[in-house]
A protein has these predicted regions:
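Non-heme Fe(II) oxygenase catalytic core, chiefly the N-lobe of the double-stranded beta-helix
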Residues: 3-103, 108-142
Length: 142
């Protein structure tokens, strides 16, 4: 992903807390029942992941990162924002232009993805998801 070697060394061991409560809160959804808060408690994940098959390193970035463990929140969020801006530069982004009978597959372990709006009143779409066994969280839970 073309990150400077110094930055790579600095981020190698960082752990982020991923929280659906955080990402929903960014959109204004802040009312959660106690059992929902328990079900959506933060999950710790290493920021840098090594793919178990290819051994390629990638950043595990998502809109639901709420902090970096051990960092003051403002600095953590500014740093994550900078990494997200870097990762979503046009040179790193694939945009699929759908045509009839297309099949698109990706490996969630190394891909940031986002759905875009589409005209569901006039366009027929068949979406299916397959999930194989996952490695689960990549950092000790605190």
């Amino acid at each position: 992903m073309c990150i400077r070697d110094r930055t790579k060394a600095e981020i190698e061991d960082l752990v982020c807390e991923h929280s659906l409560i955080y990402s929903r809160g960014q959109l204004g959804f802040t009312e959660f029942l106690p059992n929902e808060r328990v079900a959506m408690r933060p999950v710790r994940q290493r920021l840098v992941r090594t793919h178990p098959v290819t051994h390629a390193k990638s950043l595990f970035l998502a809109s639901h990162i709420g902090t970096i463990v051990g960092w003051p929140r403002p600095e953590a969020m500014a740093f994550i924002r900078d990494l997200m801006e870097h990762a979503t530069q046009p040179r790193f982004v694939y945009v699929h232009r759908w045509t009839r009978h297309d099949l698109v597959m990706w490996d969630n372990r190394t891909t940031m993805h986002r759905v875009r709006r589409f005209d569901d009143l006039h366009v027929v779409r068949d979406m299916r998801r397959t999930t194989t066994r996952s490695e689960g969280p990549t950092a000790a839970q605190g």
